[in-house]
């Protein structure tokens, strides 16, 4: 059996990060984790571009524009949607995740879902660099792996 998998080498790649400003305290930690991983895997600082959007709901549109531009090898989406006492959380989470997946499938550019969807601020903090690792870093690793896997197909 011949096995294909992406390598973890970001040299020569260009990455866009789309980040939601809402819950910026959490999102900034995710960005830091993503940036650290990208640089550790040889993505040059000038090849990492950050695009701020007001909230998570706006992420898919900007991700689509960036993917369609063909300027980027991958788009990483980062944000934090924290459950409140209304069903708004469910609507936002569903639409953002569907929107990001749709952009990736339509554009054939890896668009990585790094948006936290948590029940509490404590859970978000845990996933932004404490107990549960940093999901921004995980998203960056996924981006690098997917770029290289696609190149090998």
From Swiss-Prot:
**Pfam families linked to this entry:** DMRL_synthase
Q: Name one GO molecular function term.
A: 6,7-dimethyl-8-ribityllumazine synthase activity
Which residues are recorded as binding (2S)-2-hydroxy-3-oxobutyl phosphate? 85-86, 127
Whether Transmembrane counts among this entry's keywords is: no
- Which EC class heads this enzyme's classification? transferase
Q: Return the GO cellular component terms, semicolon-separated.
A: cytoplasm; cytosol; riboflavin synthase complex
Which InterPro entries has this protein been placed in? Answer: LS, LS/RS, LS/RS_sf
Residue ranges of coiled coil:
none
* NCBIfam families in alphabetical order: lumazine-synth, PRK00061.1-4
Provide the function of this protein. Catalyzes the formation of 6,7-dimethyl-8-ribityllumazine by condensation of 5-amino-6-(D-ribitylamino)uracil with 3,4-dihydroxy-2-butanone 4-phosphate. This is the penultimate step in the biosynthesis of riboflavin.
Q: Which family is this protein grouped under?
A: Belongs to the DMRL synthase family.
**Descriptive protein name:** 6,7-dimethyl-8-ribityllumazine synthase
């Amino acid at each position: 059996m011949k096995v294909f998998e992406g390598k973890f080498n970001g040299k020569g790649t260009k990455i866009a990060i789309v980040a939601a400003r809402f819950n910026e305290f959490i999102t900034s930690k995710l960005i830091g984790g993503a940036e650290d991983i990208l640089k550790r895997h040889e993505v040059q600082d000038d090849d990492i571009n950050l695009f701020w959007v007001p909230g998570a709901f706006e992420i898919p549109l900007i991700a689509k524009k960036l993917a369609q531009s063909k300027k980027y090898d991958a788009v990483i989406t980062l944000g934090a949607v924290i459950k409140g006492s209304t069903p708004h959380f469910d609507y936002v989470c569903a639409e953002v995740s569907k929107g990001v997946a749709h952009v990736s499938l339509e554009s054939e550019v890896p668009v990585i879902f790094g948006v936290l969807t948590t029940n509490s601020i404590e859970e978000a903090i845990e996933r932004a660099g404490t107990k549960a690792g940093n999901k921004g870093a995980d998203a960056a690793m996924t981006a690098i792996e997917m770029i290289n896997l696609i190149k090998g197909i």
